[in-house]
Amino acid sequence: MHFLQNAFVAATMGAAPAAATPLEKRSCTFTSASAAKSGKSSCSTITFDNIAVPAGETLDLTGLKKGTTVIFEGETTFGYKEWKGPLISMSGTDITVKQASGAKINCDGARWWDGKGSNGGKTKPKFFQAHKLDESSITGLKIYNTPVQGFSILADHLTITDVTIDDSAGTSKGHNTDAFDIGQSTYITIDGATVYNQDDCLAINSGEHITFTNGYCDGGHGLSIGSIGGRSDNTVNDVTISNSKVVNSQNGVRIKTIYGKTGTVENVKFEDITLSDISKYGIVVEQDYENGSPTGTPTNGVKVEDITFKKVTGSVKSSGTDIYILCGSGRCSNWTWSGVDVTGGKKSSKCKNVPSGASCSD
């Protein structure tokens, strides 16, 4: 499930900065996306003051100077156009991204929402492309109503802290509004995220040394590993998803792999996860996805081993299923299963190749 022509003001002295050496410290305030694109390399601190990004353009913050700080002030908005985006793209090393008190990034996704997401209808822009944003941090952003996917992460040593993505206005027509999609990344930490959306709160398609903790996920598809298989990188290793709540969502926690494809999911921990009002599956592991949907027939190409479900507890709606495990023969192994207590839904009679220690009837 997977992302500038006028005013430029130098904040400190009121004059536009000259070309900067790595040792120079210059603070720049931009009020247009075009000025930011042309002037970003001259600034060690970049402030966006109520910036309105024109329709069909990306707020281009790629190739920032090492050590740059980016601050969003006021309300950041985007013009309407049917296009793929992203609305914001950022890359660089040792970049600090934060938001001033009271500021917000308003994508106004309702202009694109048509109930089809990225599967048809209007072409919708993805929100934030964090590719090659390495050894960096994003803190405190408040983001509203992404048209489709939120953060596309392909980075090393990126920490995202206390970010809110509020797509709650899209309950009716929002679709594919994944909050955090991670691929080909290492040492990613997402701490304290608050998400209201209509798709995965977290989706890890590949990567290693990834932590998601202290999260709150409301309205979407839950906390997901996958789908795994069919990409250039099909390995997920050393992931911890912990101390989080998933409410009013389709799934609680899940691992899904692609029918007939190969890959590896290993050393994944789901710990201290609280579920509430889950409509489909509390815990789900499926090795049968094809063309985005389950087939009911698992295949053996992806191994799912050294998986921990510890203190995953809470409620599923009566129309849903507490736990569903559908593994290929011998492909799910060495699982740790403790303190799991998911209730309220049905007990599945269709589980297959459940590894020792796990259970579809807990």
From Swiss-Prot:
Catalytic center residues: D199 (proton donor), H221
Residue ranges of PbH1 repeats: 155-184, 185-206, 207-227, 236-257, 265-287, 299-344
Propeptide residue interval(s): 21-25
Record-annotated disulphide pairs: C28-C43, C201-C217, C327-C332, C351-C360
Catalytic activity: (1,4-alpha-D-galacturonosyl)n+m + H2O = (1,4-alpha-D-galacturonosyl)n + (1,4-alpha-D-galacturonosyl)m
GO cellular component, as recorded: extracellular region
Official protein name in the record: Probable endopolygalacturonase B
Organism: Aspergillus kawachii
